Curated annotation (Swiss-Prot):
Acetyl-CoA binds at residues 359-360, 378, 396, 413. PANTHER family: BIFUNCTIONAL PROTEIN GLMU, NUCLEOTIDYL TRANSFERASE. In the N-terminal section; belongs to the N-acetylglucosamine-1-phosphate uridyltransferase family. In the C-terminal section; belongs to the transferase hexapeptide repeat family. The gene is glmU. Its EC number is 2.7.7.23, 2.3.1.157. One of its GO terms (biological process) is UDP-N-acetylglucosamine biosynthetic process. Keywords: Acyltransferase, Cell shape, Cell wall biogenesis/degradation, Cytoplasm, Magnesium, Metal-binding, Multifunctional enzyme, Nucleotidyltransferase, Peptidoglycan synthesis, Repeat, Transferase. It is an enzyme of class 2 (transferase). Mg(2+) binds at residues 102, 221. This is Bifunctional protein GlmU. Its cofactor is Mg(2+). CDD domains: GT2_GlmU_N_bac (cd02540), LbH_GlmU_C (cd03353).
């Protein structure tokens, strides 16, 4: 049975206390709404998102990554609440999966399990450790009797720990029939989607409660809950990669972005941060190193190294306190204390301590190209744009501002001056 998916993302998110819309808050470097959309499009090609607060800003991010998403706008002034969000929604398929935009931890497999039940109305529920302000679910004889919003619950109902996860699967025709019957006769004067359970019950529709994991279906409302969710996601990310063969030393101290990829046998030491769409292939990343949107293949990086965006390393050693940016290094050794930015360095080249590619003149960035089997002495500055051909020796302390031909020795140092007995003349009278 084909499914249409609707994601509710129109809320103000006031508890987040941020100028950024709640669904654009990030977990592991990806906004909440993008986490949800990735799973939604894996299940259906008919995905809609309901927006209101800062609609244009959220819509821009959604369509950049998922251009096939249908965008709807909720009239919060006249139709507030979760049921109000569904006005104007026209599903293309036989049933609808309704998700919340602030639930980025939900796994695709859990949604597939929810969809595997053929009841006309399925409701995701969980046993809460602390029910807090969740809506309470009353179940009798394996069927949901009703959902009571916390604000409207009596003392007895507040004792119930079976809570509404806010995720529904409903027959499209049933949704179309019941939605106009929902009113706002409640304490908040909102149109609650939870009332659809009561209306379905009145029509003798079987309502199936599907129990799910509380942590996975956690809604995120403030920065504290955001941090809890990110920790949870980090654990899942690292567990997955460890199961694929990656070694993590003290994994609780590392950060791995949601889009990072490991291939082959990799090893990651403590306090490492790997971000963006970085790809690590058969490599070792040593302690306290940072890698941003870079590819590292058959190489070792660190400790205390920094690969800024667009680096490509192959068969290369990057040592401590080396920073690279937009650098392509193939079979290169850069052991310590160097900055290699906007450069291409070829195989067999050794970069001495304190080497700098001076790539910026205050207006533009320029490239340094270094060929094969070049030996670069310590404390060398390359004033880009500059090209060093193969099999060159650059003497320590040189400032290189001209191209160097193949096989040459390049020396450029300030003249030396030594004054005999100067110390005694200055300090001993």
């Amino acid at each position: 049975m084909k499914t249409s998916i609707l994601i509710l993302a129109a809320g103000l998110g006031t508890r987040m206390k941020s100028q950024k819309p709640k669904v654009l808050q990030e977990l592991c470097q990806k906004s909440m709404i993008l986490h949800i959309l990735k799973k939604a499009f894996a299940l259906s090609d008919d995905v809609s998102v309901v927006l209101s607060h800062q609609k244009e800003r959220v819509e821009k991010e959604i369509l950049e990554y998922f251009p096939k998403t249908q965008i709807l706008e909720q009239d919060l002034q006249n139709y507030p609440g979760t049921a109000g969000a569904l006005r104007g929604f026209e599903p293309k398929n036989e049933r609808v999966l309704i998700l919340c935009g602030d639930m980025p931890l939900v796994e695709q497999t859990s949604l597939e399990a929810l969809l595997s039940n053929n009841a006309k109305l399925n409701l995701a529920v969980f046993k809460a450790r602390d029910p807090k302000s969740y809506g309470r679910v009353v179940i009798k004889n394996d069927s949901v009797e009703k959902i009571v919003e916390f604000k409207d619950a009596n003392t007895q109902e507040k004792e119930i720990n079976t809570c509404n996860a806010g995720v529904y699967v409903i027959d499209s025709r049933l949704l179309k029939e019941l939605l106009p019957l929902i009113d706002n006769n409640n304490a908040a004067k909102e149109y609650y989607l939870t009332d659809i359970v009561k209306l379905a019950k009145e029509k003798d529709v079987m309502i199936k409660a599907v129990f799910v994991d509380e942590d996975e279906f956690m809604g995120i409302n403030d920065k504290f809950e955001l941090s809890i969710a990110e920790n949870f996601m980090q654990e899942k990310i690292k567990k997955y990669w460890m199961q694929q063969g990656v070694i993590f030393h003290l994994p609780q101290s590392t950060f791995i972005g949601a889009d990072v990829e490991f291939v082959g046998e990799c090893e990651v030491y403590e306090n490492v941060r790997i971000e963006g769409k970085s790809k690590i292939i058969n490599s070792i990343i040593k302690s306290s190193s940072v890698i941003e949107n870079s590819i590292v293949e058959n190489s070792d990086v660190g400790p205390l190294a920094h690969l800024r965006p667009n680096c490509e390393l192959k068969n290369t050693h990057i040592g401590n306190f080396v920073e690279c940016k937009n650098a392509k290094l193939n079979t290169v050794k850069a052991g310590h204390l160097s900055y290699l930015g906007d450069c291409e360095i070829d195989s067999g080249t050794n970069i001495g301590c304190g080497t700098i590619t001076c790539n910026y003149d205050g207006v533009k960035k320029y490239k340094t190209i270094i060929g094969k089997n070049v030996f670069v002495g310590s404390d060398t500055q390359f004033i880009a744009p500059v090209k060093i051909e193969d099999e060159v020796i650059i003497a320590a302390g040189s400032t290189v501002s001209v191209n160097v031909e193949k096989g040459a020795l390049f020396i450029n140092r300030a003249g030396h001056k030594m004054i005999k007995d100067y110390y005694y003349k200055k300090f001993q009278k």
